[in-house]
Every structure is written in C-alpha cells, then in structure tokens.
C-alpha cells in the first residue's frame, strides 16, 4: 500500500502520500487580524495618546496630561448587535490630569471617550449589524531609498529619497552635468551643499573633509557660489532654502531655521516610526556600508591601540562580524561641531572610514555611517542626512547598491491595529486644536478636563474609518474559505497606497521575495491583479510589519538540518542560501546528496550542500490557504490554478456537503481556523447536546454552553448553518470541533460533492466547457443550497399623519391576506410567491392625491376609505420561498430606531435552490462550466456494474489549458471511492505517478484507469474506453436564478424618460448604437421606430399605445422622443435659438414639461390607473350591450 494514514481531528483519517516530515505546525490562520488588534489595545492606543498629549495652552499656563484608559464591557452581545443593527463596541474611559502651572492645582478626571468597535474572536467587526473586515494594507516602508536612472544620452544618474511615516520628503538627485541637488518636500531643487551649509558646515574645506574629494562634490561646490558677502555662508544657505519652501515671503535666517526645525526635527510634525528608524539605521550603518569593500587604512582600537584590521583587507561578512562590537561602540567615530548659526547646534557624531574605490584601485573614497542613533529618535537627524548624502555620492564610485522598491524588505504590512491607531491619532490631533482654544478662552479656576475635551472628532474619525474606508470591507461570507481568505488578504490599494490606474507591471508582478510570504497564485483576475494578494500559509508579521517566513536552521559544522525554526524577513533572507523543503535528507538528518537545489537572492540554482544555511519548513509555505487546498497543484498551469483558488471562494454551502475524497490535508486546518465552526474552548465532557446548544462540563466543575447557529443569513445571502458533531458522554479537548459550520463535514472544509465524472462528449451538449448532469443530482438534492434574503418595511411619521401596519389594505381581496396575522404581518412558514404581501402597510393620502370625483364623494359622504394608499411590502420578482423568520422592532419595546421611524419589520425568506440549467459549476483546477442539460438517469452512460455517470465534461477542456491535475484527481478519486478511503495529497509533496498507479491497481481498476461505458439510451457500449472517476465539483454563487430577468412595464428615468437599466432597477435591455445599425442594415424601419419611441421615451406615445393594445384598437403614430426634447432644451440653455420646423418650414411646438396635464411624468402607477380605467370602460360597454 502506497502512503500512510494521518488523523485529522477526531472524525477523519486520510491516507497521505506526503514524504516530507512536517517540523512546524501551521500558525493560527487569522492571527494577522487578532494579534494586531490585541497589540493595539495593549500598546498602540496608549502610544497614540502619549504622542499627542500633553497639550498646553498658548500661554503655557495650563497643561492636559494623559494618565490611562480603561475599556469596559460591551453594551450588546454579538448576537444582539447583529439583531439590532448595532455595532459590537465597548465604551472607553480615559483618565486625564489638568495642571494649572500658575497655582500648581491638579484636577484628575475620567472622561467617556466614545464606543470603540471590538474585534470578535473570528477576527471580524460588527458595524451597524453587518460583519466587516479590515484588510491589511501593503505599503512602502518608511526609510531611505536609492535609485538610478539612465537619461536619453545613456548617462547613469542617481537619486535618493528619505520617506518618513509622516512629514516632508528629502530627495537627492544628480543632473547631466554631474552636479548633485537636493529637494525638500517636492519643491524646486538646490545644490546639496546648500543644505550641508545650513546644517552648520559652511566652509568648502569642511565639506571636503566630511565627504572626501569626488567629482560630484567638486562640481556642486563650484556651482554653489557665495553670492552675498554680507551674510555668512550658513545664513545665505538658510535664506536660499526658505525662498524655495516659501517663495515670495520675506526671507530671514531665523525664520528659515524655525521652518527647517519644524519640517524635519519636530517629532509632532515629522515621524519616521519605529520601522523608519530601523530601516535607516540598517541602511546607513557602517557595517552595511563596509561589506565587501577593501579598507584603505588600518583600523585601530582607540583604547588599546591594537590594529584590528590591516589596510588592504577585503571586509567580508566574517571580518565585519569579528570587529562588530568595536564598530557598534563607535570605532572611527568623529564628532563635528556645527557653527552657531546652524539649524541645530548640537554636535554631530559620524563614523568615517576610507576604502579603495572599486572602479579605480588608486583612488580612496570616504564612507560615512550615521553612528546608530537610538531607536527612540523618531525624527531624521543631521547625522542621517550627512550619511545619506555620503551613500548617494558613493553610488557614483560603485559603492553601495540601489534599492528595488518591489522587494518585500522595502514593503510592509499595516494591519488592523496600525490602521486604527493612525485613525485615532487623526481624531486626537483634530481634538487638540479644539482643546487649546478652550483652555485659552475659559476661566482657569473652574476648568475641568471634561469641559475642555470634545470627543466628537475622535468618534467621527473612527466611525468614518469603519464605515467608509476603502480597507474596511463587507466580509465575503460565501463560505468559510472565503471568510478566511478575506481575513488574510493584503491590499496595495487604499489611503497612502497605490491607485489602480497608476500601478504598473512591476508592482503587480511576482517577486522572488514573495516566496513563503505572499502567494504567487491567489490574486483576482482583472484590474486588481497583483495589487491584492494573500498571505502565504506560514506567513507571519514581525513587530515592524515585515512578513517573515520560517526556515529550519542548518548546522554547517555538524552537517545537519536541525529542527530549530528561524523566522526571516525578506532582507534578512537575502544574505543566506536556502534549500528547498524536498531536499533529500539521510538518517542523521544531513543532506543526502552533495549538491542541492537552493535559492539565493532570486537565483534558483544548485549549491554544494555544505554552503546551505537554511531549509524550507514545508512545500506549502509558498502558497496561500485556498491554493493549498488544490490537490495536484504541481500538475496545473498557474493561470488555471489562480482560477481554481478564486472559485473555491465562491462555492455555495450545500444542504449536505461532503469533504473531498482527494484532499490536501489542508481542509481540517482551514475549517478549524475559519471561525465558522464551534470549537471547544476548554477540555471537558459533553453533558447535553441537541441541535441548538451543547453543554460541556469542565474538569473544574464549571459549565461551558455553546450555542449552535441554525440557518442564519450570511453576508452573501447563503445559509449559515451549524451542525452538532458531539453526543452526550463524549470527552472533548480544547480545540476540538463541537459543531461543523456551513460547508463542513466532520471537521473538514467541504465546499462541494464527489460525483462520478466522465470525460466524453455527448450529443454536443458539452461544447465549450458546458456541463452535462444527471437528474439524480437534482432529485437527491446533491447540489441543493438554501438562500436567505432579508426584506424590511418601516413606518414613519409623514406630514399627513403616521403610516400604519395593518390588515385593512384598500382594494385588496381576502385571498391576498390569507397568510397575514391580525397585525398585517406574514406568518412564519408561509409559502410566498412574487407579488404576495409580506407586511400590509398604508400611508395617509393628502387631498391633492385625490381625483375630482373622489374629492366630491369625500365632501358628501366624508368617505374615509380613500384617505390611505397601499404601500405594503411585497415579494419582489424571483424571491419566492418560505418565510423563515419575522422580527418586529418598535419604540415601545425600547429598540433603537432611526428618528421618524415608529416601527420596523424584517422578514426573512428562505429559498431552496436545486441545481438547474444555467448554474455555474467548477472543479478545483480552474475547470469551470455552465450546466447545459440535465439528462434523466436512465439516459446517462453507465459503468459495467450499472452505476450511471453523474456528470459529463468535455475532454477538449484539458489539453490546451494544461490543468492536468484534474485528470490525476479523477483517477485517484475513483480509487479512493472503490477502496472506501479519503486521501491527502499535499501540494508539491503529493502522490507521484507511481503512487497513483499503485493505488489504482489496489482498487482493482483497469491498468489504464479507463473503463468501457454503455449508452443509457441504447445499452450499446461506446466505441472507445473512457476516463471515468470521482472529481470534486462545487456549485458557484453565480446562479441563473439571480440573473434571469424580464420586464414589460417598469420604472423610467426622470430626465430622459427612458427605462432604467439592470435587474436591480427592474430595468430594460439597452438597445445601443450598434444594434440600431443592425436594424438599419435590414431596413426594418417600423421595428426600429417602435424601439426608439414607444418602447423607450415617447411619453405620450407609450401611454396611448398601451391604451390601444388593451382596447384592441390600432396603435397610433408615435410622437417625439423625450430625449430629443432634452437635447433641444440643452442647446437652448446654451443660449442657442434652437427651433424645430416641419417640412413647410413652420415651427413645431414641442410640449413643455410644465404645461397641461398630459405632460406628467408617466410612472407605473399611472399605467395601472390607465389599466383600471380601460377595464371600467369595457365593463360599462358590456353592461350597455346587455341592456340593449
């Protein structure tokens, strides 16, 4: 027997064909959400408050300090928040201290700071009753970047940018004359020496001393001449910078100093964040700068006088490591003192070394390091600026390297916590202005923190973020896999990110650093391709927001691959050689072969095994969760694998789902972490279990109660239904399944079913990917799903009186009311069809709505019956089903309703949808198709044992698409069915062809895995043997019921009077320019005329035509289309005297919208009236005939 058995949870064993021993379990798959939010509550929120506060007033006599905060219990439970359309949020109370510096008086007070949305255990937020997800954002990391560009003459120029988290950008660039310039915040450029002089190093000699002698420095100094001898060089430089930043304003050295301090050195205005400081120190650190350079002077320890490194030594990684301690402690540190008129007068510490120029062995180049400012320094420092300039000047000498902005060492993730912290900071900084003003205006004696703090800007910022940010998305809840995928999504779009139109190919492309960090397969098709990605299965964020991936450490000395796990970011990994997870190991755990395949900085090549530093932990660390659920992924073309991964996320939960016979072993983990199942929180024993709740008695005697959700509507309108898995007496451990969620079976993801599939053509019905299906799948509810839709009706106060929910509806027969209760609301369990009343509602009708006759009757009889009009909630088209639930909210019951609303009724209708012609089906390999024919079971081809085939697919769909994985799955699936087992074939480590054929033989199938098939209609065998097997097929959310649409009379657009478009608006079909050409080409003038008039926007014409049709009279001639009138009016509004003339040159009067009664906009109601009027006239005529 090939393979070995693996237990997944307590309910499933699979035969696995994996050969690689897993040394590391998958991390919790939604930790990117939950960990980030937890960190925000524990540290992030406090940091934001400490950043903005304390706040002083303008005279510095009062100060408001932050003391601490407390988050209390949420107002609603999760379930209540869902039902009441409320947010699941907790009140936050912040303690402030107000200090009066004149009197020394201190007032401490706790202030309510609004309700803060709280993340659920599943990693989601409930905002206004809807479940939402904050998608993590992929952005460029703050730091310093160097780039090169080739001009039109083929000359290479260099550039550099310091990008902060917030604040002004500082750029350097060279021009064609080899002069180096700087730009501050995208303004006009100035020679870079001007900025150096402004920092207090004004003499040319000083500049040469710092940077060394090079063409760039020399050319720039020649350009930067002393224009005004009255000013010192520093003052002149400061004025020149001020002129660039504030053109047209009077320039003084003092104002320029304060402006530069505010731009770059004020922590309130300029922030690198922890990650920016880390990246700058890493880039401008002397250890990075010296790597692989030849030192030009001996390095001497200042304290001991010992020569550490001789001149002429190549500074390899090992040499640098040997003197790392001395380098960190300030080896070759030089302190420069700026002059007194500099922007900052503090001494500047740099580390300075001389190396041999790689391009010219006789030249010596000066290298400067920024002497590692502390992690606490969150602004840029003069040392950073000088070290950046040095790196920039060295690029021209061939020292240092330019950055690749698509490298994942330069792109980081802003997860929920950080996005929220930024939003709160925004709100607090708006509040800060407000607080300052109130402190200054009001009387100091009686002020309390409560009086000066206005929390509205903060609550508004949070509300705005959750409600309308591009990154706050309505959760994709088609099935648990789509939930999980959505929580792990990484978007490069959003505020501070890219825009679709500006993103080029490079940023969308797969980069070698994506390996183990971002999935190269799972990304949407269409305009967002490559901008929206998914975290790989083992991907994890470090404290700076860079994605790490785990590797096994290789002990080079012992020649053994250890089980020690090291998590590396992309730029750390660049220094090492990493072997693949499928490298063969011997008994001792060393590499079995002297040469192994490995990766180093984007090169995949063979390396001697004694040079390897790390090894992958698992073959599936490359791909995301949805991709890791595709068996035989290694045999599929990547384009089709992308479709397969994306389509699994669109699978509809079925009534009785089945886990795949051929899985990958990922199904258990995906279901477990998705949040859709009920998982045991503690060990214990089940004491009670039914369909609605499970009780577990813990060992310490306390009781855990788990509530099971039944048929709740998901965000996508599918049924969110959980099924209890345990029974009384079962012992459960923490992490065990208590109940399956939707699309799960026995604790595994089960998106579809395992039908018997044959690759064969049948009467041409599976042309172009169409799917032929047996009627068994319809009758046995194999692909039946339940869909829930929610409809609501509310009563409001109107000017003419309140609306009312009632059974007394005018002009409605008793038959239409048979399912309504005494209040006029539909009963639960009623079967409803299109047009049935769900909630009877009447609205008061003003006098102006009545016709002349009605007004007369009203005056005579005081007839009250006509005072209301029917505004009942009815079943829209295509929404037939069974009433599953009704919820009623009223002010009397204390429900929170919008202002002006007295009562709200929600009706949930469940539809049971069987599979039908037009529905979309798919496999897991991107093999999708539409059901074209449902064939009776007796006509389907059958196997020699009499089993009819369930589905027939077109064999032509396989070769050109190169997704051979489906054929492998087909054969292995048939073997699994015959053997009665489930199989796991993990990605890139699954069943080989030998394993496949061994299993096929073990199952007693023919050696080619094909079979003779018999035609169900004639009983004759088909000419050739056919590949028949079991393939996992899913039904997708694109169902024909949602797309079918037809209109006869419906709503019209206000301006053009043409029918609206789209199913949602009950619109018509667009008859566009090209369609008009087609009718013109056939000379079908009458057809064309009626399409452009009656059927579109000839308002009078369509009414008269309707009347003519109902009365059986000839249809009158059409009039002028409304859009022609709109055109004429538009031209008149431009001041053109536009008139319409007939053939005798007489002016034709076009109707005006505000003339006469005929010109009212015709709505469906008016057509109804016309219908009633015609019926009454017909009745009168009939009675008159009878009398005669």
From Swiss-Prot:
Entry-linked Gene3D superfamilies: 2.40.50.100, 2.40.50.150, 3.90.1100.10, DNA-directed RNA polymerase, subunit 2, domain 6, RNA polymerase alpha subunit dimerisation domain, RNA polymerase Rpb2, domain 2
InterPro entries: DNA-dir_RNA_pol_bsu_external_1, DNA-dir_RNA_pol_su2, DNA-dir_RNAP_su2_dom, DNA-dir_RNAP_su2_hyb_sf, RNA_pol_bsu_bac, RNA_pol_bsu_CS, RNA_pol_bsu_protrusion, RNA_pol_Rpb2_2
GO process terms (BP): DNA-templated transcription
Gene Ontology CC entries for this record: DNA-directed RNA polymerase complex
Coiled coil (residue ranges): none
Top EC class, one word: transferase
Reactions the enzyme catalyzes: RNA(n) + a ribonucleoside 5'-triphosphate = RNA(n+1) + diphosphate
Family to which the UniProt record says this protein belongs: Belongs to the RNA polymerase beta chain family.
A molecular-function term among this protein's GO annotations: ribonucleoside binding
Gene field: rpoB
Protein name (record): DNA-directed RNA polymerase subunit beta
EC id: 2.7.7.6
UniProt entry keywords in alphabetical sequence: DNA-directed RNA polymerase, Nucleotidyltransferase, Transcription, Transferase
UniProt KW Transferase keyword: yes
């Amino acid at each position: 027997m090939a393979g070995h058995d693996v237990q997944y949870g307590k309910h499933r064993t699979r035969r696995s064909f994996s050969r690689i021993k897993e040394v590391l379990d998958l991390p919790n798959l939604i930790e990117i959400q939950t960990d980030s939010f937890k960190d925000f509550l524990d540290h992030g929120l406090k940091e934001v408050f400490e950043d903005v506060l304390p706040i002083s007033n303008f005279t510095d006599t009062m100060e408001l300090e932050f003391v601490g905060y407390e988050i209390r219990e949420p107002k609603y439970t999760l379930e209540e928040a869902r039902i009441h359309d409320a947010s699941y949020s907790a009140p936050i109370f912040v303690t402030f201290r107000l200090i009066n510096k004149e009197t020394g008086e201190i007032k401490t007070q706790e202030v309510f700071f609004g309700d803060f949305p709280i993340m659920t255990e599943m990693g989601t937020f409930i905002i206004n009753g809807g479940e939402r997800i904050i998608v993590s954002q992929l952005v460029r990391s703050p730091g310093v970047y160097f780039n090169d560009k080739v001009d039109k003459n083929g000359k290479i120029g260099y550039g550099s940018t310091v990008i902060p988290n917030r604040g002004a950008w500082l750029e350097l660039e060279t021009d064609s004359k080899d002069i180096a310039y700087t730009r501050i915040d995208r303004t006009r450029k100035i020679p870079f020496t001007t900025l150096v002089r402004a920092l207090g190093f004004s003499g040319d000699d000083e500049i040469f001393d710092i940077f060394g002698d090079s063409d760039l420095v020399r050319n720039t100094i020649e350009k930067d001449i002393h224009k005004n001898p009255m000013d010192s060089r520093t003052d002149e430089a400061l004025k020149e910078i001020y002129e660039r930043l504030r053109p047209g304003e009077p320039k003084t050295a003092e104002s320029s100093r304060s402006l530069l301090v505010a731009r770059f050195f004020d922590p309130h205005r300029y922030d690198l964040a922890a990650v920016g400081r880390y990246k700058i120190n890493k880039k401008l650190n002397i250890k990075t700068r010296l790597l692989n350079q030849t030192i030009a002077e001996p390095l001497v320890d200042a304290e001991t006088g010992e020569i550490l490194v001789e001149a002429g030594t190549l500074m390899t990684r090992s040499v640098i490591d040997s003197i790392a301690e001395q380098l960190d402690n300030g080896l070759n540190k030089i302190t420069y003192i700026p002059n007194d008129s500099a922007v900052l007068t503090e001494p500047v510490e740099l580390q300075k070394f001389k190396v041999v120029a790689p391009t010219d062995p006789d030249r010596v180049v000066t290298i400067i390091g920024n002497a590692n400012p502390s992690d606490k320094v969150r602004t840029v420092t003069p040392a950073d600026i000088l070290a950046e300039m040095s790196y920039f000047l060295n690029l021209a000498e061939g020292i240092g390297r330019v950055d690749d902005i698509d490298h994942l060492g330069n792109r980081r993730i802003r997860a929920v916590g950080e996005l929220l912290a930024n939003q709160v900071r925004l709100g607090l900084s708006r509040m800060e202005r407000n607080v300052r003003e109130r402190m200054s205006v009001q009387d100091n004696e009686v002020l309390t923190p409560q009086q000066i703090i206005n929390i509205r800007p903060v609550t508004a910022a949070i509300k705005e973020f959750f409600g309308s940010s591009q990154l706050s998305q309505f959760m994709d809840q088609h099935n648990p896999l789509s939930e999980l995928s959505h929580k792990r999504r990484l978007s490069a779009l959003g505020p501070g990110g890219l825009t679709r139109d500006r993103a080029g190919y490079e940023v969308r492309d797969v980069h070698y650093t994506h390996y183990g960090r971002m999935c190269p397969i799972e990304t949407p098709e269409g305009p967002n391709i490559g901008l929206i990605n998914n975290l790989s299965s083992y991907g994890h964020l470090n404290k700076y927001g860079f994605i790490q991936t785990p590797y096994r450490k290789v002990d080079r000395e012992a020649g053994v691959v250890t089980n020690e796990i090291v998590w590396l970011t992309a730029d750390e990994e660049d220094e090492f050689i990493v072997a693949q997870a499928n490298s063969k190991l011997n008994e001792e755990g060393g590499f079995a072969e002297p040469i192994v395949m490995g990766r180093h900085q984007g090169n995949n090549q063979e390396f001697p095994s004694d040079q390897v530093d790390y090894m992958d932990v698992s073959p599936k660390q490359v791909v995301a969760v949805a991709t890791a659920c595709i068996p035989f992924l290694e045999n599929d073309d990547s384009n089709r694998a992308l479709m397969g991964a994306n389509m699994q996320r669109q699978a509809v939960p079925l009534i009785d789902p089945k886990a795949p016979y051929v899985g990958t072993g990922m199904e258990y983990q995906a279901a477990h972490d998705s949040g859709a199942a009920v998982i045991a929180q503690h060990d214990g024993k089940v004491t009670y279990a039914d369909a609605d709740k499970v009780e577990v008695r813990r060992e310490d005697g306390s009781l855990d109660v788990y509530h099971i959700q039944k048929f709740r509507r998901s965000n996508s309108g599918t049924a969110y239904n959980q099924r209890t898995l345990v029974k009384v007496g079962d012992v459960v451990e923490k992490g065990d399944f208590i109940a399956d969620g939707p699309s799960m079976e026995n604790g595994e993801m089960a998106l579809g079913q395992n039908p018997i599939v044959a690759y064969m053509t049948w009467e041409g019905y599976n042309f172009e990917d169409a799917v032929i299906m047996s009627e068994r799948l319809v009758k046995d509810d194999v692909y039946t799903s339940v869909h829930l839709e929610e409809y609501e009706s509310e009563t409001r106060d109107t000017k003419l009186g309140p609306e009312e929910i009632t059974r007394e509806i005018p002009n409605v027969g008793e038959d239409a009311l048979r399912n309504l209760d005494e209040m006029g609301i539909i009963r639960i369990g009623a079967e409803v069809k299109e047009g049935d009343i769900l909630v009877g509602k009447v609205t008061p009708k003003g006098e102006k709505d009545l016709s002349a006759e009605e007004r007369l009757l009203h005056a005579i009889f005081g007839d009250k019956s006509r005072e209301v009009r029917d505004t009942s909630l009815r079943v829209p088209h295509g929404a037939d089903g069974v009433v599953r639930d009704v919820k009623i909210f009223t002010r009397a019951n204390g429900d929170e309703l919008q202002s002006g609303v007295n009562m709200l009724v929600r009706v949930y209708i469940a539809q049971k949808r069987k599979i039908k012609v037009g529905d979309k089906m798919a496999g897991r390999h991107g093999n999708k198709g539409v059901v074209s024919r449902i064939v009776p079971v007796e006509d389907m081809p059958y196997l020699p044992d009499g089993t009819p085939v369930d589905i027939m697919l077109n064999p032509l769909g396989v070769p050109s698409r190169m997704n051979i994985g489906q054929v492998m799955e087909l054969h292995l699936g048939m073997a699994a069915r015959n053997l009665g087992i489930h199989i796991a074939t993990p990605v890139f480590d699954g069943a080989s062809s030998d394993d496949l054929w061994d299993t096929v033989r073990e199952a007693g199938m023919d050696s080619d895995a094909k079979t003779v098939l018999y035609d169900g209609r004639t009983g004759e065998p088909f000419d050739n043997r056919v590949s028949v097997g079991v393939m996992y097929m899913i039904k997708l959310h694109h169902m024909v019921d949602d797309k079918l649409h037809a209109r006869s009379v419906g709503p019209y657009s206000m301006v053009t009077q043409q029918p609206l478009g789209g199913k949602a608006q009950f619109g018509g079909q667009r008859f566009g320019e090209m369609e008009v050409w087609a009718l013109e080409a056939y000379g079908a003038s009458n057809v064309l005329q009626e399409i452009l008039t009656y059927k579109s926007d000839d308002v009078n014409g369509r009414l008269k035509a309707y009347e003519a049709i109902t009365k059986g009279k000839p249809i009158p001639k059409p009039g002028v289309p409304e859009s022609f009138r709109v055109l004429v009016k538009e031209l008149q509004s431009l001041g053109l005297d536009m008139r319409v003339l007939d053939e005798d040159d007489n002016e034709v009067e076009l109707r005006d919208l505000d003339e006469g009664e005929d010109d009212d906009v015709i709505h469906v109601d008016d057509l109804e009236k016309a219908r009633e009027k015609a019926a009454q006239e017909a009745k009168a005529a009939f009675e008159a005939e009878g009398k005669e």
